[in-house]
Amino acid sequence: MKVLHIITGLGVGGAEQQLRLMLRHLPTDSDVVALTNAGTVAQAIAADGIRVTDLGMSGNRDLAALPRLVRIIRAGRYDVVHTHLYRACLYGRIAARMAGVRAVVATEHSLGDSQMEGRPLTAGVRALYLAGERLGRVTVAVSPAVGARLHRWGVPRQRIRVVPNGIEVERFRFDPASRARTRQHLGLPSGAFVVGGVGRLTAGKRFDVLLRAAAQLPADVVVVLVGNGPEEPELRRLAHRLGLDGRVRFVGESTHEAPYASPGESTRESDAARAPDLPSLLSAMDALASPSPEEAFGLALVEGLASGLPVLYASCPAVEGLDAAERSGAAYCPSDPDSFAQALHGLRGDVPPHREAPAAVRHYCISRSADQLMNVYASVAPGPTLEVTPR
């Protein structure tokens, strides 16, 4: 089966990293088109042997990109066109229809109750999205919560399929040696209780709540923020105002191509000067906190659970969709500093001697998600197909 993936950009981000990981587990002949910003993840996908094209789109209204995209689809003779993220879903669905491809799948990676990919959910955004959605066959939601939001928007229920994000579970297994190396690399005190926050440093992630909570806790509590974004300068200023100098580490992006390296490539035996990868950073932490009140899935928290970390969340559909008995290690916490401070204080006094991933993370093994996605492709692709039994 030949599949073209169209995505808005390929800089470092959750949807972009998820696409790269999924491509490594799909038994398809795949090509990728980035409308713009074919950055770090594009290079990583190409290194995996996948053909990547940068369409060079100059902006949301660069209509000249549309005929170029149509030509690519026609020349590739694809069985399925799969679009990712708002702009790519709109242009990709239109281009596929113009190229004569009706088997179009779109994944909705980041739809909240009040925003989509950081943009406010105005009537215009919704109308444009729904107009494009009608040109496709199936819209994939990364969680039941996103599926419910799509249906409330007006997407017919029969056109929505839930395929959760996935991770390579074993790559996130807790590693004591990696923990020691990473804590030394970050200059963390030996007895520090390290609280992590992973994600884009944007206002919606509410990492300010985590800093204000840390300011209420003893001096041995250190915050490690993994990611970058427009709120970083303000978060640095806030940390200084709160008297947290020396107790907050801004480590920048941890590019997922390190933990999602090629088979056989070891990322944890690398030179000590190399920046730690995400599994190493998670091993160095004692708890993971997500004060964001609105998430589409909560992939970073699943990765934290896979590392055996206790996680606190204000919103995490990935965890909320599980039975209570399967949520071991994950606890809901309202998105305010007092609540997070109280919850972290309780965790600080109860650090387990050993860390094991709860069984729940197996629900989000990437191979299972890839099998489910193949069944979506089979339902829309022309010709005889074989249903895949999820692993």
Predicted regions and their residues:
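Aromatic "clamp/platform" in nucleotide-sugar-dependent glycosyltransferases that forms part
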Residues: P293
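N-terminal strand-loop element at the rim of the active site
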Residues: H5-A64, R149, G229-P230
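Carbohydrate-associated surface elements
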Residues: A145, G166
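Nucleotide-sugar donor phosphate/pyrophosphate-binding loop at the beta->alpha transition
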Residues: L63-P67, R102-V105, G112-L135, A148
